[in-house]
From Swiss-Prot:
The active site is at D95, D269. Substrate binds at D95, S96, G97, G98, F99, D149, Q192, G219. The keyword Glycosyltransferase applies. This is Queuine tRNA-ribosyltransferase. NCBIfam families: Q_tRNA_tgt, tgt_general. It comes from the Bacteria.
Amino acid sequence: MKPAVTYEHIKTCKQSGARLGIVHTPHGSFETPMFMPVGTKATVKTMSPEELHDINAKIILGNTYHLWLQPGNELIKRAGGLHQFMNWDGPILTDSGGFQVFSLSNLRKITEEGVYFRHHKNGSKLFLSPEKSMEIQNDLGSDIMMAFDECPPMPAEYKYVKDSIERTTRWAERCLKAHARPEDQALFGIIQGGEYKDLRQQSAEELVKLDFPGYAIGGLSVGEPKPVMYDMVEHTEQFMPKDKPRYLMGVGSPDALIECSIRGMDMFDCVLPTRIARNGTCMTSEGRVVIKNAKYADDLGPLDPNCDCYTCRNYSRAYLRHLIKAEETFGIRLTTYHNLYFLLKLMEDIRQAIREDRLLDFKEEFFEQYGLNVENPKNF
């Protein structure tokens, strides 16, 4: 049986080794490297599906944990699945719920069967297992589902992480057995291992034997220094299949998107562009702009003079500052629209640079303009 999702390799950048490819799914194809906006509760905050199409978002994320708790996977199944429910006709990836459960560290208990935990709002007792995660994701009907994994904290003791990745492998096998719709939903495995290179290798090799149609690197971008993350990605990549999509979870800052594309990753997601937009922080071609700052009060220029998105074509920095200061929802819509447009355009530029075998040159140009070449660059 042909997997529901396949990877087509187009070319490798001669200068950097980055990959240009196409991921084919039941709801359409997208070129990689690609950034995926996060729609936690079946909506990318403040953005309509039409606006997502306008900015060239090809695939979006849904969050299994949140959708299970509200409105419930049974309702979404009755609605015809997540695509119908939220009126999105492109590909959707759902996470397994694992990351959310593991972030409730003081409210949870990990066992071999799964994780017992308390609802983050009302305190009710809940249980999530590989089988339950598959049932929920099968009901949601996403194109790409993620295996239920344990996401160990970083740093963590070696023995703890080793036990954790071995449990993640056993859970991955249970996910494959429980997955009811492999013909129209692809299940990806998640490589863990914290900051231990031998454990990253062990996790990758064990999961590759299970022959998932795609693989993710999890447990990074959780607060470790970026050089550590880049080192782990570079090390882990060599144990990942060349003929399947590679997804780096939780990465969305411009520098990391470029650096990890260079290191052979294809897919990225992060709440960063939408989360910082709600505080009025914007990514621009000249670096970070905190639009609430007083210096923009009388600035009638566009947010980013080098951007041709709807926000930058139509509204001034002064107007955006006014809206954010006044806590007007429209301001958040405009900053969110711009940030997502900016990152999706960055990915387009990365793909073009790979086509032209000049991604390292592009990195230098971008870092210089964005202000990332200084000793302590501003981060988000």
